[in-house]
Amino acid sequence: MTTDSDQAQWSVGELLDLFDVRPDGPDRFTAETGGDVGAGQDQRQVVEGTQVVAQAIVAVAKRFPDKSVRSAHAVFSRAVAVGSSVELVLDVVAEGRSTATAIVAALQNGRRCLSVTVLADVPTGDVIRHHLPRPEVAAPANANVSEMPMIGRELRLVDVVDVNSPDEIGPPELYAWLHYDPIPTRDDLAKALVAYFTGHLGISTTMRAHPGIGTSQAHLTVSTAPMTISIAFHEPVCWGGWLLYTHESTQVGAGMSYVRGAVHTEEGELLASFAQEALIRPLRTSDTAIDARSRF
């Protein structure tokens, strides 16, 4: 099990190193889980799913070096465990002069854990342009500092103190300010870093509207897991300060929730839009036989 002191040594630089997958043959890449660095912030021995999504984005960017990654859609089928490396196998569906598509299979110990469909293209000049304005919320200086240990990352929440607490009741929305140091200059790593946080607060956003339930109960009395993540990047993806992640849960029921969101710069530019589907269900009796640190 990782400890708070272990996680306090995790840095943004190390995270970017994890994202930077290495070639391992034609249309194949190897991604490291990072040991304790890769463990989820809840101390379970399960890698954050969006870490592998970020690695898939970098793999596709390396496969199509003359193009820019525009979107990624991931479907999670099983958890990636801390330890063994992950094999990223690219199925190039189409590769043209302006666009390309690849489906990335992420395998660990020979078993497929997730599939990521990635679209890349060559950006062109605008015919028309508009974007969703940044929400008018409290500035980072007036938001609540959140403890999510990582050297070089600051997280501040608007109108929420403890994102995991069942006592944090409010509308099904969350606004999170993020500051990274360093900010990568490589386009693929910048997009990977933006994508990484898109899955962290979706379930908390949904639970916020329901008294008596919070993500502190996840994997203990309630079963939760992200099932899909989609992200679209809006060129150019570059920033120099704080990022605002907006989350809105539009529906929950029948054991699944849906959250949509946006990533803006502090100046108001829209860098990305994202969506998450997540499982929220009673913990089955059979699940209690599995170590809580290893549950999906």
Set out the residue ranges of the language-model regions:
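Terminal targeting signals and extreme-terminal segments of soluble enzymes
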Residues: 1-296
